[in-house]
Swiss-Prot record:
Cofactor note: Binds 1 Mg(2+) ion per subunit.
Assembly: Heterohexadecamer of 8 large chains and 8 small chains.
Residues noted as binding substrate in the record, renumbered to the chain: 116, 166, 170, 287, 319, 371
Cofactor dependence: Mg(2+)
PANTHER family hit by this protein: RIBULOSE BISPHOSPHATE CARBOXYLASE (PTHR42704), RIBULOSE BISPHOSPHATE CARBOXYLASE LARGE CHAIN (PTHR42704:SF17)
Positions of modified residues (N6-carboxylysine): 194
Cystine connections: none
High-level lineage: Bacteria, Bacillati, Actinomycetota, Actinomycetes, Pseudonocardiales
Recorded GO MF terms: magnesium ion binding; monooxygenase activity; ribulose-bisphosphate carboxylase activity
SUPFAM superfamilies: RuBisCo, C-terminal domain, RuBisCO, large subunit, small (N-terminal) domain
Record's protein name: Ribulose bisphosphate carboxylase large chain
Amino acid sequence: MADRWNAGVIPYAEMGYWQPDYEPKDTDILCAFRITPQDGVPPEEAGAAVAGESSTATWTVVWTDRLTTFEHYQAKCYKVDPVPNTPGQWIAYIAYDIDLFEEASIANLTSSIIGNVFGFKPLKALRLEDMRIPTHYVKTFQGPAHGIVMEREHLGKFGRPILGATTKPKLGLSARNYGRVVYEALRGGLDFTKDDENINSQPFMRWRDRFLFCMEAVNRAQAATGEIKGHYLNVTAGTMEEMYERANFAAELGSVIVMIDLTIGYTAIQSMAKWARDNNVILHLHRAGHGTYTRQKNHGVSFRVISKWMRLAGVDHIHAGTVVGKLEGDPMTTAGFYDTLRKDSIKADLSKGLYFDQEWASMPGVMPVASGGIHAGQMHQLIHYLGEDVILQFGGGTIGHPMGIAAGAEANRVALEAMIKARNEGVDYYKEGPEILKKAASRNRALDTALATWGDITFNYESTDTPDVVATPTNA
């Protein structure tokens, strides 16, 4: 073994970044990386390289390490396990001392953990599968601007999922016609409607016009139904100043909720979360762009990690998968996402892709959003897989209804209430779901038409991101 202080290049494992006897501290930030080393690179060296390059190391020995307590600041790869049934891949467990990170900064956390290692030549591929964020670090963050409980109290809606829809077509409508869609959907029975991720302020519909017509629709629908309604006004823009201007205008109009896209960046998300809490406005996050780095199983960042970062950052909603819809969503993996967002205390469960216990230290939960290819005929499956604290967004499943938008909203509301009633009466609603829907449809033409239109539509493709311990393709 080379002397740690010999000039030149020394293997990372021999510089202290591989420590199989290390016992992680309660205050350490722990990471589970899926590593695919280049041929001839031992997994221990690959894990040590990730630890080194994401903490204190560079490619050669530097004498200035002696000016620090380098053993304290070095990340330590303390375990490397082979991935079951996947030759050439390992899970490397790495511990980082809490002193390596600035308090309450997702930008600093991510710059360290994922900032410089994903293009590292000794690795063919690298994926951050999970993190354990210690209570000591969790408590430095604001967390969700409101959280699940406060949102329900704000809206006065309890005991069932929240219903929503994305306005379609998402591009091309004038502001007036856009507002008409919002009104019909809310009047028909939905709780929320929303802008989609790429509606900002385009030539066909400027943001101020959209906000005015949407809030007119919200107010009229509230007056007609006696229920609190909302429309996710997307305030995403090119600068923080412009986002604040749009958000402030939304608040002045009385909107209960605004929306941002994941693409605005972590610091902007935290800034908007602070604004949302200060202004008593719910904050919805669309996970636009996440699939570019979360979907592939061997390289990138798992969405369960993004879920943890966004809970810390302070959003109230985030899209988290449907299981039965058109987008990627293995049942067990999706359950892990939902647990991460909603639960106060989470136990490691490899069947859900959860590598660590996680304590949230009373930080409020984030309301998951299920959207993309779902319809009223799947209501029993959605409640079974996703539970009660979820927002179910039926965009095409509302606006594509043959009888019109209001009828589409009515069909979804009737299906939901029939399923919740059956659940509350002790009926096995998952097993009896089709019969429950059929019975409800016999008394409601809108639901009957929805079932006739979409009843046989499914998206049963095998998921790319499944837990390694069990083979669980999407199966609805």
